[in-house]
Amino acid sequence: MKLSFTKMQGCANDYIYLDCRASGVPENIAALSEKLSRRHFSIGADGIICICAPRTAGADAMMRIFNADGSEGKMCGNGIRCVAEWLYTHGIAKETLAIDTLSGLKTVTHQGAGLWQVEMGAYSAMPADLPAVNMGEDALVNKVLTVDGKVWQVTCISVGNPHCVTVVEDVDSLKLEQIGPGFEHHANFPERINTEFVQVVDATHLKMRVWERGSGETWACGTGTCATVAAVTELGICPAGEDIHVQLRGGVLTIRVLPGKQLLMTGAAETVCEGTTEV
């Protein structure tokens, strides 16, 4: 059977996008995501994002995210910008789009020429919202976490999916393929966790790398960038209410923390190619 797809990327966080609005999500989507995401052997991507018919009144579409290991994610910040760009170029040319996710309805606004701003909603540092266990009941800001025998200072943030953020001196020197799995599968995070390693350049500029649950190190993570800015704001490193520019391996995202812990994310979305593949 031939399957039509669009490959898109936001800050090099690349996914295979499927139009499932009429057909629904394929029954074998987990296996399909594993197969098609394999770099060098297939299309290659961080996973598959299905663009589905909306399930919520007022939504233009719904997105479902499947990681490279077949597991389903709740939200993808880079992915939602690409969904907006796909809809915009495939017949829903609205300047403001409402996209449903497993983390709720998100508003995405066109900023011109492939640039989109996403209202990501409010973040939380409370253990129950991640979830996290054995870390106390108060906000998970500047906590101690021992990973594979090494002690880290971490701040844990939920932005609809869970993140563990740690500030480091030199992010480029880290061997994430050795460090990341210990965070992802730590017993304190029963649903696994995404981990961000951030280097502070100055009060409005950060440099970050990410280890995503289910995908390993990726070149960017929109929700992870939001969680990182939320964390350093909680720590008093960066100011709320100002644009914070985060350099990722794949590009730059701009995040702002608004009153009520609301987050705004601005970044690009680009179509890489379109095609069909045998499945």
Go through each PLM region and give its residues.
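Active-site glycine-rich loop that binds ribose-phosphate moieties when present
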Residues: S124-Q153
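A glycine-rich beta-to-alpha transition motif near the start of alpha/beta enzyme domains, typified by
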Residues: M1-A113, V165-V279
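Intrinsically disordered, low-complexity regions enriched in acidic/Ser/Thr/Pro/Gln residues
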Residues: W116-V118
